[in-house]
């Protein structure tokens, strides 16, 4: 009898079921893993959002001859043609006089800054304090102090540097800027605020405006005055008053000159010294620019302890002697006398000369007059643009007033300024008309302005714009739809799952082939028997 060896149907069905279920599970897991991997990769790549790289801040202290003003500026860290789009966010006036008045007590300068600096700390996010640059630029007052007493000027700057190094900001130094730099930075500020460098197009992108004419800048401080503009004619490039300025990818050839000792305060000292020189009496004088019924006494030192008037000192000079000036409120005589502080004859009627023999190309285009120019026009109840006749008639009317009438005319009455507005107005007339050569036709092109929008017209903004050329731009930030740790973890998990499924399926395929091979061998053995 023979025994037949064969697999029962039940056994074969059980083996097939044993392999089929894991295979289906592995295929499903593999398919799901592939779908998830493709999906999160597509989402991560195509749904990412490009964010602006945030804001940067900068602080500039404008240390003028009569006061110090602190400005806080901000701009996008990603810049336009290497220059930041800067805006003013905060302004604080330091109490007291300018830093040049601390020549005899430089250790007291930091105390004056403290109140404003505490406010500034609240304007800049605390986590950005360490990366926020702070600069102090001193102007004509310190330029004069350096010429008069370099040691005192250096001690004032050293005291300032010591103070700011203890502050949380990135202190970049305290320096005395040149008159030429002051003029250029003022010109940059004026044109930037008026949109002559950049404007937003329909797509809200910053672009250079086509065919826009730049605006000249007229700045009046306490110790100096500046004029800056792009001339229309060929300029004498051999003079030091020609500068090239690069902003937002464009280069501008600029004429700029700073007149030391012709700021409002120093010019008035020159005027008082001239009155003393021409007076038969040396202790009681009349002043045609002071209002009627007003008198004031100064020491000789107040008038002559300045480099701007030292050459006008009388022979018997004693800084403690007292001089009394009595106002006569004479508009005609005031206008005549003020002209004498300028040396117009030095130009010998040359068209390309302003005064004191200084070269100046012919003026061209619109101008903005700010700082002291604006405040004087405002005292005359004038602002914006107006005719030369209007300016002259307003000056005449103001200079004709009694002292008791001035508080009624001035919104903010301050004796120091009120007594001098008549002088300042006549000073502006001679500077603009006989010096810069503005005429009845070109005068209305002068716009007397204090600020544009929320930003003051001051050299400090132009200084900040220039500095942003040297501050590296940051790349835009990319915000991903899936946080990187989650994305990496998910990617690793489903990649591992897919690989395990592939390995398992490969194992099943190999096991199936071995099984079939053994079945084939078994059947062959049975047939042989």
Swiss-Prot record:
<feature type="glycosylation site" description="N-linked (GlcNAc...) asparagine">
    <location>
        <position position="238"/>
    </location>
</feature>
<feature type="transmembrane region" description="Helical">
    <location>
        <begin position="486"/>
        <end position="506"/>
    </location>
</feature>
<comment type="similarity">
    <text>Belongs to the GDA1/CD39 NTPase family.</text>
</comment>
<keyword id="KW-0067">ATP-binding</keyword>
<dbReference type="GO" id="GO:0017110">
    <property type="term" value="F:nucleoside diphosphate phosphatase activity"/>
</dbReference>
<dbReference type="GO" id="GO:0009134">
    <property type="term" value="P:nucleoside diphosphate catabolic process"/>
</dbReference>
<feature type="active site" description="Proton acceptor">
    <location>
        <position position="182"/>
    </location>
</feature>
<feature type="disulfide bond">
    <location>
        <begin position="347"/>
        <end position="353"/>
    </location>
</feature>
<dbReference type="GO" id="GO:0004050">
    <property type="term" value="F:apyrase activity"/>
</dbReference>
<dbReference type="GO" id="GO:0004382">
    <property type="term" value="F:GDP phosphatase activity"/>
</dbReference>
<feature type="transmembrane region" description="Helical">
    <location>
        <begin position="23"/>
        <end position="43"/>
    </location>
</feature>
<feature type="glycosylation site" description="N-linked (GlcNAc...) asparagine">
    <location>
        <position position="149"/>
    </location>
</feature>
<dbReference type="GO" id="GO:0009143">
    <property type="term" value="P:nucleoside triphosphate catabolic process"/>
</dbReference>
<keyword id="KW-1015">Disulfide bond</keyword>
<keyword id="KW-0106">Calcium</keyword>
<feature type="disulfide bond">
    <location>
        <begin position="289"/>
        <end position="334"/>
    </location>
</feature>
<dbReference type="GO" id="GO:0017111">
    <property type="term" value="F:ribonucleoside triphosphate phosphatase activity"/>
</dbReference>
<keyword id="KW-0547">Nucleotide-binding</keyword>
<feature type="binding site">
    <location>
        <begin position="222"/>
        <end position="226"/>
    </location>
    <ligand>
        <name>ATP</name>
    </ligand>
</feature>
<protein>
    <recommendedName>
        <fullName>Ectonucleoside triphosphate diphosphohydrolase 3</fullName>
        <ecNumber>3.6.1.5</ecNumber>
    </recommendedName>
</protein>
<feature type="topological domain" description="Extracellular">
    <location>
        <begin position="44"/>
        <end position="485"/>
    </location>
</feature>
<keyword id="KW-0325">Glycoprotein</keyword>
<feature type="glycosylation site" description="N-linked (GlcNAc...) asparagine">
    <location>
        <position position="402"/>
    </location>
</feature>
<dbReference type="GO" id="GO:0005886">
    <property type="term" value="C:plasma membrane"/>
</dbReference>
<comment type="function">
    <text>Has a threefold preference for the hydrolysis of ATP over ADP.</text>
</comment>
<keyword id="KW-0460">Magnesium</keyword>
<feature type="glycosylation site" description="N-linked (GlcNAc...) asparagine">
    <location>
        <position position="454"/>
    </location>
</feature>
<dbReference type="GO" id="GO:0005524">
    <property type="term" value="F:ATP binding"/>
</dbReference>
<feature type="glycosylation site" description="N-linked (GlcNAc...) asparagine">
    <location>
        <position position="381"/>
    </location>
</feature>
<dbReference type="Pfam" id="PF01150">
    <property type="entry name" value="GDA1_CD39"/>
</dbReference>
<feature type="disulfide bond">
    <location>
        <begin position="92"/>
        <end position="116"/>
    </location>
</feature>
<feature type="disulfide bond">
    <location>
        <begin position="399"/>
        <end position="422"/>
    </location>
</feature>
<feature type="topological domain" description="Cytoplasmic">
    <location>
        <begin position="507"/>
        <end position="529"/>
    </location>
</feature>
<keyword id="KW-0378">Hydrolase</keyword>
<feature type="glycosylation site" description="N-linked (GlcNAc...) asparagine">
    <location>
        <position position="81"/>
    </location>
</feature>
<dbReference type="GO" id="GO:0045134">
    <property type="term" value="F:UDP phosphatase activity"/>
</dbReference>
<feature type="glycosylation site" description="N-linked (GlcNAc...) asparagine">
    <location>
        <position position="392"/>
    </location>
</feature>
<keyword id="KW-1003">Cell membrane</keyword>
<feature type="disulfide bond">
    <location>
        <begin position="261"/>
        <end position="308"/>
    </location>
</feature>
<keyword id="KW-1133">Transmembrane helix</keyword>
<feature type="topological domain" description="Cytoplasmic">
    <location>
        <begin position="1"/>
        <end position="22"/>
    </location>
</feature>
<keyword id="KW-0472">Membrane</keyword>
């Amino acid at each position: 009898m023979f025994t037949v060896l064969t697999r029962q149907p039940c056994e074969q069905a059980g083996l097939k079921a044993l392999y089929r279920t894991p295979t289906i599970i592995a295929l499903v897991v593999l398919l799901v893993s592939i779908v998830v991997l493709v999906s999160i990769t597509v989402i991560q790549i195509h749904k990412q959002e490009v964010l602006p790289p945030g804001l940067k801040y900068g602080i500039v202290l404008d240390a003028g001859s009569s006061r110090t003003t602190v400005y806080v500026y901000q701009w996008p860290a990603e810049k336009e043609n290497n220059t930041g789009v800067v805006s003013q966010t905060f302004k604080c006036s330091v109490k007291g006089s300018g830093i040049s008045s601390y020549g005899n007590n430089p250790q007291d300068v930091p105390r004056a800054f403290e109140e404003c600096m505490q406010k500034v700390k609240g304007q800049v996010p605390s986590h950005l304090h360490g990366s926020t640059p702070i600069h102090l630029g001193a102007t004509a007052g310190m330029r004069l102090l350096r010429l008069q007493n370099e040691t005192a000027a250096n001690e004032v700057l050293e005291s300032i540097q010591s103070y700011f190094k203890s502050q949380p900001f990135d202190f970049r130094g305290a320096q005395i800027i040149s008159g030429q730099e002051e003029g250029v930075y003022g010109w940059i500020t004026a044109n930037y605020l008026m949109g002559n460098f950049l404007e937003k197009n329909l797509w809200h992108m910053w672009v250079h405006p086509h065919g826009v004419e730049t605006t000249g800048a007229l700045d009046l401080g306490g110790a100096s005055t500046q004029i800056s503009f792009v001339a229309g004619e060929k300029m004498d490039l051999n003079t030091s008053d020609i500068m090239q300025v690069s902003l937002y990818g464009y280069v501008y050839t600029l004429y700029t000159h700073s007149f030391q000792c012709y700021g409002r305060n120093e010019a008035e000292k020159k005027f008082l010294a001239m009155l003393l020189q021409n007076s038969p009496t040396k202790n009681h004088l009349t002043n045609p620019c002071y209002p009627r019924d007003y008198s004031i006494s100064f020491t000789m030192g107040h008038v002559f302890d300045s480099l701007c008037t030292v050459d006008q000192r009388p022979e018997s000079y004693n800084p403690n002697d007292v001089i009394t000036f009595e106002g006569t409120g004479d508009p005609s005589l005031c206008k005549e006398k003020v002209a004498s502080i300028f040396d117009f004859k030095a130009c010998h009627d040359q068209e390309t000369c302003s005064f004191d023999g200084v070269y100046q190309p012919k003026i061209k285009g619109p101008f903005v007059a700010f700082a002291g120019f604006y405040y004087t026009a405002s005292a005359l109840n004038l602002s914006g643009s107006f005719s030369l006749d209007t300016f002259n008639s307003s000056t005449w009317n103001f200079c004709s007033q009694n002292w008791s009438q001035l508080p009624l005319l001035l919104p903010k009455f301050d004796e120091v300024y009120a007594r001098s507005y008549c002088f300042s107005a006549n000073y502006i007339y001679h500077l603009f008309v006989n010096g810069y050569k503005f005429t009845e036709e070109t005068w209305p092109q002068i716009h007397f302005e204090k600020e544009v929008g929320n930003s003051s017209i001051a050299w400090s903004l132009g200084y900040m714009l220039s500095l942003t050329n040297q501050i590296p731009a940051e790349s835009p930030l990319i915000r991903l739809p899936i946080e990187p740790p989650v994305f990496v973890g998910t990617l690793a998990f489903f990649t591992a799952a897919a690989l395990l499924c592939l390995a398992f399926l490969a194992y099943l395929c190999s096991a199936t082939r071995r099984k079939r091979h053994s079945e084939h061998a078994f059947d062959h053995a049975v047939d042989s028997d």
